[in-house]
Amino acid sequence: MSHDLSQLRKFVSPEIIFGAGCRHSVANYVKTFGARKVLLVSDPGVLAAGWVADIQASLEGQGIDYCLYTDVSPNPRVDEVMLGAEFYRSEGCNVIVAVGGGSPMDCAKGIGIVAAHGRSILEFEGVDRLRVPSPPLILIPTTAGTSADVSQFVIISNQDERMKFSVVSKAVVPDVSLIDPETTLTMDPFLSACTGIDALVHAIEAFVSTGHGPLTDPHALEAMRLIDGNLVQMIANPGDIALREKIMLGSMQAGLAFSNAILGAVHAMSHSLGGYLDLPHGLCNAALVEHVVAFNYSAAPERFKVIAETFGIDCRGLTQGQVRQRLVDHLIAFKHAVGFHESLALHGVGSSDIPFLSRHAMQDPCILTNPRESSQRDVEVVYGEPL
């Protein structure tokens, strides 16, 4: 009997604890790894918001030694990863805990890679290049969108080259994720919009990815339903913990989908754009999403129709072209409703930047699972549309 190996699908995820207040149990999970000393990774904003103090209190309450590393930029950098790994080694740590958004969590993943391998993080760009297990890793997200807390991705900025690069490996999936919607209560409207759009794009791209399958589709669809149906309300009612929980759950579902199905051209192009101009990742996604959807539609019309129906669009009696336009219009209206109106030109992107951006986008692993095969010229055209 012959089997089509291209149809096989894997699914990796951390141990997930979801619910308000679960962050306070972090010490219980740290103890299961025989922690000698914990490297606690965060950033100045999360530290000021008070969430780090909760983690410190949990560790101190059970007599667990730790040291704190907060030298993390909004887009974590190579030097920050390398300095963090040196700090990890010099302090004699053997467990890593990160509390924060995607930046501290990605930095923590990078620190674990370098600590385990003893080499520069730059050497691990690409897919499945890790050969040594990382130290035990516990992640506590304080934003609802990046899904670094459940994914097998690490995104790091190389400032020398003005680009972001990806490390993709199941070795960077955290051991434990404590997903506590209370930690998102300090997010401002812009950050809520950025991370929410990111999560929505994760779900859309995972559903139409060439790596999609029955293990990821339910997560992607539920993520789209939760985020599309609740993000605008949540931004308008930032203290509503029930809405926060729905968006946090949507982010988690989107993360489980894209971590296993991978992504597409929106993220390949966003990584290039964000690395070049150091822009917020969600803002880049918002600028590009409807243009990439319009470009990709012909390659997966039935799956895009399911997305449209998930957003509540009545597709009965519509042609493919009409469904495509309704979906694009919905995405534009949605991003406007959460506060994204500006063109890329207002953020410093010019037509002369497009060849550079496109070359790097074509080298991103996410482009490999885009539903429509793309040339550099295709990517250049799409980059030009939101200017």
Where are the regions a protein language model picked out?
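Short, amphipathic C-terminal "tail helix"
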Residues: S351-L387
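Glycine/threonine-rich beta-strand-loop-alpha-helix active-site module
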Residues: D79-E182
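N-terminal small/polar loop signature for handling phosphorylated ligands or for N-terminal nucleophile
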Residues: L47-R119, Q233-R244
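Gly/Pro-rich interdomain helix-loop hinge
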Residues: Y276-D353
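Glycine-rich phosphate/pyrophosphate-binding beta-alpha loops
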Residues: G145, M252-N285, D364-L368
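Glycine-rich phosphate/diphosphate-binding loops that line cofactor/substrate pockets in enzymes
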Residues: R23-L39, A57-Q62, S90
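N-terminal amphipathic/basic leader segments beginning at the initiator methionine
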Residues: M1-F33
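Carboxylate- and glycine-rich phosphate/diphosphate-binding segment that chelates Mg2+/Mn2+
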Residues: A57, F153-A261
